[in-house]
Amino acid sequence: SDLLHWHANAAEWSYVIAGHCRITVIDPEGRSEVKDFGPGDVWYFPRGHGHSIQGLGNEECHFVLVFDSGYFSEFATFSMTDWLAQTPKEVLAKQFNLPVETFNNFPKKEVYIAQGPVPEALPTDPPPASENPPPLTHRFRLGAKVPEVVPGGTFNVVTQKDFPISATMSGAILKLKPLAIREMHWHPNADEWQYYIKGRARMTVFGSKGRKITREFGPGDVGYVPMGYG
């Protein structure tokens, strides 16, 4: 499990490639949402929303994390375990109205990822008044959306129109057939960040005044195109 934490200077967008996980997210109003995610699912956590990620089953869970700021830093990521480790036991006892000795075996430093038991399945019909969900869900099932089929492949996009909570990020899954080309284009209102999952591709970026750069990409590579560049 990736234990409860939040990011002070960036929102988080993710696409699940393989495996399954359970997300718990708490917004600043104290409303919480618990959802299971699988391949093709997308999550979005606005800046400051606390969240944890727990693996499900016996398989690994692989997902791509993207942050909406190039200034994202672990120094602006705040962990609940780190905070508790830095807080005197006497203060914790008053905070949670528990005996001081309750905290004797708490970690003495941040726990980034912890191994734990596989959680039970979520109830299909939660007990009445047991949930306090936020008005907008943090999950979008992009893999279940019917893609646009074109002669050179398929294209599936999720924007804020589809996923209202995702105010600062849009995402797309582009699958190109062998030797197919994504036609010349540009985005006037956003930068483009790319992650290559399978296959190989070549991209040329045009920056005006005769400037261009061409690079080849393969699995695990990242591409970036500034706003307005062709």
Language-model segments: what does each one mean?
Residues 7-29, 178-181, 186-209, 219:
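Glycine- and acidic-residue-biased ligand/ion/polar-headgroup-sensing regions
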Residues 2-3, 22, 41-43, 47-52, ...:
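Histidine-centered metal-chelating micro-motifs
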Residues 1-4, 91-177, 183:
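A short, N-terminal "cap"/entry segment at the start of jelly-roll beta-barrel domains
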Residues 13, 27-48, 176, 193, ...:
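Short acidic-glycine-tyrosine-enriched beta hairpin
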Residues 60-62, 168, 190:
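Fe(II)/2-oxoglutarate oxygenase catalytic core
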Residues 11, 38-39, 47-74, 218, ...:
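Ligand-binding loop in jelly-roll beta-barrel domains
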Residues 62-106:
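A contiguous, mid-protein "functional segment" used to position or interact
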